[in-house]
Amino acid sequence: MKVSLSWLKDYIDIRMDAADLADALTMAGLEVESVSNRYAYLQTVVVGRVMEVRPHPNADKLTICRVDTGDRSDTVVCGAPNVSEGMLAPLAMPGTVFPDGSQLDQSVIRGEKSEGMLCSDVELGLGTDSSGIMALDSSLNVGDRLAQALGLEDTVFEFDLTPNRPDCLSVIGIAREIAAIQNTALKYPDYSLADKKNTISSLTSVRIEAPDHCPRYTARLVENIVLKPAPFWMQDRLLSVGLRPINNIVDITNYVLMETGQPLHAFDFDQLTQNRIVVKTAADGDKFVTLDQKERPLNHQMLMICDGEKPVAVGGVMGGLNSEIEDTSRRVLIESAYFNPVSIRKTSKTLGLATDASHRFERGVDPEGTVRAVNRAAKLMVELGEGTLIEGIIDEYPQPQTINRVSLSVERTHRLLGIHPDGNQIKGLLESIEFKVEKMIPEGEDQRLIVVPPSFRVDISRPEDLMEEVARLAGYNNIPTTFPAMPAEARPPARYLDLRNRLKGLMTGAGFTEAITYSFVAEAS
């Protein structure tokens, strides 16, 4: 998973440089696979001024431009319709490697030499507009490197997370770990929405017929939306983590997914028959066309999100072609649910279909995070999609999660870890990652802490899990090297083993060779 440093800084004040931060996170159990300068490829792209535009003698749709880069003038063949004399535009020099992996070389186009390339937003990975070259602000300095001129300096961390840490499959999840490392506060987005009445209940409903597969389903409705490109800052952040911008509504669901770790889905509300949602399993032999335009065979173990008469999504995996957001969509139903991880894993494997959503659902998302995520998405759709929020929220929760209390012995923690933090120090370490210590019980020399893990830590169920958290937060490098606490005693020789070894020695001495067969192979083989 990729996370950009600039995105992390929205939620926490980072006091370390990128290299030290990567080391600290790795030592805390979140392995940083790589640290890269996101805009390194722009070092060979400069701000150029188009000084002259003349027709290409051998091609009607091409022009030949003379571009000033401050200390030199380059001749560039250009096919963009918006190129004009006097404009500033990004000029890629020979040797530039673009985000799609292609490399620019000096070339001859229809008989005319081209010493560079005037670039569009999409070619530079800075947006989705491919209609013409990128027009730069006239106040920029000609000849400056584009990254520095636009302030595009960002570091991207790529993590190799273990399957037991789905809480870190989000920007906020990583920021939470940094907050614990630095002992600083985490700044959450505003998830609140002021609902004065429950208008949504008169427009739609949700019925869960398979609560074992879907313990919770939350939804909100936004109308009068206007589909358009998302603002540059959102597109830029999605691109930084490897997601392709599509439109403002779809981009918002992907943005909230990466921010919170909670997958969302946006339905065209007017394409839902009877304007309602039914969550149930499919029937053997059913078929369904997903968003990638492929027909998928279904079985009775697969969870489907349906409207009043038909399936509209494979629950937790991918939406359907029959309810996707289109240019004409005006009302959007936002889905935010908690699905059974085992169910999603089976469905994803059977269909051979892995998505960002299924990757998170099959590891376990926060069952208490559905409301926060759907509120966040609804607010962004009002702000960036010009939508009107329908007041009220649908929150079907037939199987609430039980509170998991774990008793942690301080004395046993000392014995197993080899470090000796007292009860209050252990309490502070656990509270730094939002664990709740309900009480501390003195029991003679052994003190116990009654700990409630946060709902997003689905991997915590026993005392040893808490000890692991104490160890990594205290620092694995602070655990002293000691001999194992086990008795070292000589055991009497086993007569059978002694006899077997003597026989083997006699047989090999007589010229025999020992054959060791594979395990679980029949004697006849």
Regions found by a protein language model. Give the residues of each.
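Short, hydrophobic beta-strand segments
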Residues: 3-7, 154-162, 215-223, 356-363, ...
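Conserved catalytic alpha/beta cores of large enzymes that bind or transform nucleotide phosphates
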Residues: 122-123, 129, 227, 296, ...
